[in-house]
Each structure stands twice: as structure tokens, then as C-alpha cells.
From Swiss-Prot:
This is Protein SWT21. The gene is SWT21. One of its GO terms (biological process) is mRNA processing. Signal peptide: none annotated. It comes from Eremothecium gossypii (strain ATCC 10895 / CBS 109.51 / FGSC 9923 / NRRL Y-1056). The keyword Nucleus applies. One of its GO terms (cellular component) is nucleus.
Amino acid sequence: MNILAHTGDIFHGRGKLHASLKEQQVWDDLRRPGHDVPQLPRPQGYTASQPIYKRLPVVCRGLTWSFDGSSLVAVHEDCGIRQYAVCEEQGPVMAPVQRFFKPQAIISHAVHPQNSLFQADSSLNVVVVSCKDMPYQLYPLHSNPDQPARALQTYNSASESTEEFRAAYAMDFLDDAHFLAGSTRNTVSLFDASRRESIWVSSATRRGCGRGQHKAIVSCFDEANERRDCVRYAGTYRSELLRIDPRTSSISSWKAIQDKSRGIYQVLQSNNGHYFYIMKRYSNSITVLDSRKSMAIVNQFKLPFQTHAQKLRGTYSTRHGLLIGDEAGRILQWAPEVVEFGGIDRSGSVPSYGIGETGITHVCAEGSRINIIEKNPADSDIFAISYSPDKYGEDVSCNAGILLMRL
């Protein structure tokens, strides 16, 4: 394991304004040798006198690689969206080449799948975001630092019944031209990125999913290295897996996981498409579903800890298998040969106690949890990691950040 780059102490401590000023200082240091680089935009409306900006840590809540591995987009809890260049010349401390801030907290987002620092078509270097009481908006990732970021497109996300804007708790691009947004009451919308109005808005019926599940929040869309059809899946905070056919706007309840967990927050697929790996809040296991058996539960990957409200997002690498961080700064690994067969051996037997990890890598100091792991699509050995202590804790130092690692 080798650390390639990191954000240093930029996000250490508490205070949103403090983090942005340290980030600016690192950027200014890069400018001194004569690099022709622009200024970084300042946060909007931040003043040191506002107590909330002194108290809250700046934790990264989303990481997305560009398709060619040239850059990394990070969404932080200071309402900032940052893009980092990934190159050997940048040195060990990472500073964003672009950043902008939203006045409101970002609930969910999706980066265009063709985004790249070397992408000539600027219409592909975009991110769609959802904020509370706001319509969905599309922003450029490459903007003029001397001007506030302006939305390229605004989408009509208002509910026809209440006329209030639906907040999206999950967003994902379906292809290069369309994106999905998941909100409350099992509602999913499909948008053409170039048009204001949705193509369709649909939800799982009360008859199909039950009265309680009908009111559930769509929390995530499935993630896969390879897709074999147009069907997508979504998880809800009622621990239900939904099946979505974008061609017909059909949404149906596919599997309800009945355990003591409190909702699905991530769905990963094996490369062969046979197995789905379900990450849940307040759970000590990853549930394994078999798509060939109507999403029957066929196994459990046991975690040596219990997840809580702060989500720990994993990734699936063809080379390194399923990876997820824990609360002790370690990466737990299930090898590819285990993941591709659902942890089921040749005899078809499954241990009653579940499958434990096949490898552990120590990454961060004890007390820092690994919140997100994202593989580099252009280099199977490189991963981006977001780490922080418990953001709800009382630790004043609250050392958080991002690092790039070669496994």
C-alpha cells in the first residue's frame, strides 16, 4: 500500500471558513513558482461570526473519478464542489484546480460519466445537484473563478400535488444524455439533461410494495462495472430494492430485506451480473442477493462492526474485489473470486455465520473512519479515499480529508 497524494491538514479541525482559507493558502503556494493557475472562488456568505461555521467539520460526502482517471470530483459538507487533477507533478498535497460553492446544502449529485479535464466538449464536464427547496440544477465543473457559478440548466422537479420541489436523495446518469433522480414516496424521475421538463415521473404503487414502503425515500441507485441491459435498481430507506425499467417508466418492488437494519444506502453488482451486494445502515453485514433466483438472499458478508447513520461506501474492483472501510481506518476486502460467486463454494454450501473478509489493509490512524472508497476506472490499483472521525462526536481536532492510494 502506497499513499500517492492527500489533502494534508486542509480539512483538519472544525469550521467551514477555516478549511477554505487553508485550501486557498495551499493553492497560493502552488502559484509562486510561476504556474499559470486561476484563483479559487471563495465560499458564499461565510463569516467568522456565524457559530455554525465554526462548529461543523468539513467531511467529504461524495467522490467521483473522471472516466480516464485524470481528475476526481469531491462534494463536501461545506456546500463545495471541488475537482482535483491527478498527476505526478502536483506534489503530495492535493488542492483543487476548480471549486465552487452552493448557498444551500447539497443533498445529492451526479457527475457526467464523460467528464474529464481533457474533455474538449464542455457540455460533458458537468454535475447535476439537488438541494432542499430548490429545483435540480446542472452546473459546469470548469467555470470562471471571478464570477459566481451559474446553472446551465434548471429542471422542473416540483410535485404536481403540492407544487413543492422534490428533493432528490439519489441521482445517477443513465447514459450520456439522461439522468435519474430518486425522491420520497418511492418516486423516480427521468430527465433529459438538455430539457427542463422530466420525461417521466413514476413510483412503486402502494399495492405493489405495501402501505409503509410506499412512503419510502429512494436512497441510492445500483452501481455496476458492466451493464447487460437497460434495467436499473434502486434502494430505499425502508430496506427495499426497486426494479426500474426506464423505457416504460415501470417501477416495481423487487425485494424487501426484513432485518434490523434501517435502510439501504448502496447497491453493488458483481461483474457477471448474478449477485447484488446490499449495504445497509445500522447493520453488521452486507446482504448478498442472487438475481437468478428472484433476488433471494443467498449469503451474508459479515462486518466486524456495525454501521450507523454515517454511511461507509464501498467499491467493487475487478482486480481487488469488494472493498469497504471501517471505523478504525482499515479497508476490508473480499477477493474477486469470492465476490463473483456470492461467497458460495463449489459444493453450494454457505456458512450460517456468513463470510468474513479475506484481507485487511491499514490506511488511516486509529480514530479515523474510512467513509468512501472509489476505484480509478483507468488504473485498477489506485483508489480515492475519504476519511474522518465521527462527525457527530466531540473531538475538536476532527481530522478529515481525502487521499489517493495505490493498493
